Amino acid sequence: MAAYNAPVSNCQFRLTHILPIPQRQGAPTDPFQMNAIRQQSDSAEPLRHDIRLLGRCLGEVIQACEGKRVYDTIETLRRTAVRFRRAGDPADDKLLQARVKQLRGNDPNSVARAFSYFLHLSNIAEDRDQNRRQRDRALAGAGPERGSLRQAIESLKAQGVNNARIRRLLSEACVMPVLTAHPTEVQRKSTLDVHREISSLLVQRERELTADELSELDLALIGQVATLWQTRMLRYTRLTVADEIENALSYYRSTFLNVIPRVYGDLARLLNREPVKPFTPPPPPLEPFLRMGSWIGGDRDGNPNVDAATLERALLRQATVLFEHYLQEVHALGAELSASTLLIEADPALLALADAGGDDSPHRRDEPYRRALIGIYARLAATARHLTGQELARRATVPAAPYDTPDALAADLAVIAASLSAHHGAPIARLRLSGLQQAVTVFGFHLATVDLRQSSDVHERVLAELFARAGDGIDGQAVDYLALDEAARVAVLRRELAHARPLASPWIAYSEETASELAVLRAAAAGRARYGRQAVLQSIVSHTETLSDLLEVLVLQKEAGLIAPPGETIAPGDGLMVVPLFETIPDLQRGPEIMAAWLDLPEVRQRVRLAQGDTQEVMLGYSDSNKDGGFLTSNWSLYQAERALVDVFSARSVRLRMFHGRGGSVGRGGGSSYDAILAQPPGTVAGQLRLTEQGEVIQSKYKDAEVGRWHLELLVAATLESSLAPQAAATSAEDAHMQQHAPAMSFMSELAQRTYRGLVYDTPGFADYFFAATPISEIAGLNIGSRPASRKKGQHIEDLRAIPWGFSWAQCRLMLTGWYGMGSAIEAYLETGAQGAPRSRRARLAQLREMASDWPAFRTLLSNMEMVLAKSDLAIAAGYAQLVPRRGLRERVFGAITAEHGRTLAMLRLLTRRELLADNPGLMASLRERFAYIDPLNYLQIELIKRHRAAQRRAGDDADIRVPRAIHLTINGIAAGLRNSG
């Protein structure tokens, strides 16, 4: 196949030479950027080779499976798209669109699959190349890479931070990525499994191979690509919560269970004062600071499919996967630890553990480690039976009592480790035992902490019903909860918390909503009792607007038996931490005031001190604040809220833990996690960090074990650097930035919000434009998540969830959520200034340039916006605008978008004094190549949406089911090409 057998320059995405920048009619002459933290390689040849190889495999598979005619059709489109992106001739662009419009029958599906899978395969190759370059860098003896643990530790030590301070921070730290099931993950688990196999084969090909071995691997590679081609890319039914649980658990098997202990091991070695010697005893496991969290099975906000049963299932399936791993590791240890007492001594404690193991085989009489591990295996199997109700052991076991706690398992493993270390077995312990010991401290018996989340208005309705059905209140008066003002609600809730009598009755039949909420909380209590308190720790309150929104959750916990009754001692870990989620711009502005009132309540302060270790978590929502106020206002409001929260918590001597509700797209807080953490206001990290990993970001970061290891390392390194770098200087510099630049930011934020809301909320007919000019309706039918795309039926922007909102703008290549309003804001500040601003335009420009170069918060903001603008394409977006039937509406809205896009580009160039990505020419060339494979998918999507909607208007439904399926295929491919669109 010429397309996929072509010379490497025809199919690779990341080139070392620079290609001419294509020019579109009506579009800026700018390159495009992908989201990644990557150093430029000295040689792109290995990547070129891998993409050429995978392209050749795909071409061979397509020709064999679909025939030469389809193959030639795909190749013609590919050549036309590449030629346009390289030469920039508008005639090629028109020819590409014309050829796409001619596709009929099943050809649109074949074309969509071909380009989509080529982008999937290129992503696999790029991920593999990242691993390769990091390894090559280490082999070359280069300095530590920015973002690595080694670089972080060396940097801190150079600033006078010693190991003791680092260890002290780690002993109290919390770094927790939280996997969520938001509907932007468009890949099936079946295809992800094949991706992993292809990546593994690429790794194997890097070894020195004989001709026969190489031929065998290449045949296997074609086999996997053929499997990919013959595997259905789309789901025919909507994902259930159970499906989402299993999808998430696949990343534990492939990545987290093995990689997280390795990250701990890497850090322990870096903190070791002396070089590790083979027979030096390995250090004991580090205190657990890096753990995993999950919303899957516990996030009820707007998802009627999540209830007590899904929470129970999530906890059960997590424990099942974990015990399968433990049993597998202990079984493997039994094979490894074959030391004989005829040859080497063993500790008395180890001998006692072996004797207690129940193995009386004469063949292992002199092998105490194996006998001890047989007993541990039996106890683990018994524990799994007790907790999961399943027989997970893959071998016969002796009768044994289950472990009561993970600490008991850890103690037995410590006995083995101590005996090995004392008798020349330290290098043996490092093979597997040390990693298992660390895993037990991290994962316990629960694997990951499942958060509960529900909207505050649901809590209000539940409490209102409980009060109404209870009759007279504590003071003898009936409580009409919904009719009370805020002060009265707070008073009623505090009285209820102080009273021991239950509010709910087991003899009353409550509404489905109330019964469900109480059942979830009771399931959480049961899960904590079964799997340990770490199984469920937080109850997040979406749409927190008032103090009563938080108190309501405490009252409901009292009803479910989660917190100690009034008058009883509050033990550490008692109950669930109530976590406010501030999402909209007004909520972010009120957040610090609400938290001050919360922490000033004596009963709450006591709970924070005794149950929560003087730690209180606050979650900030990036998605809804962006949808509410636009890119700049969202970011500035978040930044101000964080600074104000630091002051509130510092004044009350409470540790603040920020939980960042970030997504993949920049409009939802995406971008470099490392840079984002370092750009946080001083004092907001302090060893405490939770952040969501959502949608396609999960597979992008964690599908591959080595890539996953790097991303986890970035999170830990950034947390260490942000927390331990000298704070006085950082705080002083930040205060200076705020004093000098906050008025400018506030002025621009207000103007940007006015511009954004003027378009989205104040333009008549904008909702009609959005639903016509984006594939939002088609995305809703993609079966990519269990949660509905809208909170309510109908076409209202206010009811649309922030995630499909941003995903839709990415599909049509506008990425509006990541830049709209910025151009007008910067231009207005330059022209008129704010109160206290420099008097001249030149001086104001100098100020903004200083902010862009010296202030991390503003620099990161502009960097993320540049990434989004680089991926935008107004010429393609114009094609989507043509889907809007009302010409006047189309011209009014798209005209405003086009004008603001040009204005924003001009302002960014003015501030940075360069073209987009001019400081990264290698990436510029790479993106031109990649977009040559996304363009045909966009044009095909536009054409298919036209056909689909026309058929719906004619017949009320689409007679040809292939059309909507092909649309869904293009959505999949575009998302794969953009990589961070959700």
Curated annotation (Swiss-Prot):
This is Phosphoenolpyruvate carboxylase. Its EC number is 4.1.1.31. The keyword Signal does not apply. NCBIfam families: PRK00009.1 (NF000584). It comes from the Bacteria. Forms oxaloacetate, a four-carbon dicarboxylic acid source for the tricarboxylic acid cycle. GO terms for molecular function: magnesium ion binding; phosphoenolpyruvate carboxylase activity. GO terms for biological process: carbon fixation; oxaloacetate metabolic process; tricarboxylic acid cycle. GO terms for cellular component: cytosol. Keywords: Carbon dioxide fixation, Lyase, Magnesium. It comes from Bordetella bronchiseptica (strain ATCC BAA-588 / NCTC 13252 / RB50) (Alcaligenes bronchisepticus). The keyword Lyase applies. Belongs to the PEPCase type 1 family. It catalyses: oxaloacetate + phosphate = phosphoenolpyruvate + hydrogencarbonate. Its cofactor is Mg(2+). The active site is at 182, 627. InterPro entries: PEP_COase, PEP_COase_bac/pln-type, PEP_COase_Lys_AS, PEPCASE_His_AS, Pyrv/PenolPyrv_kinase-like_dom.
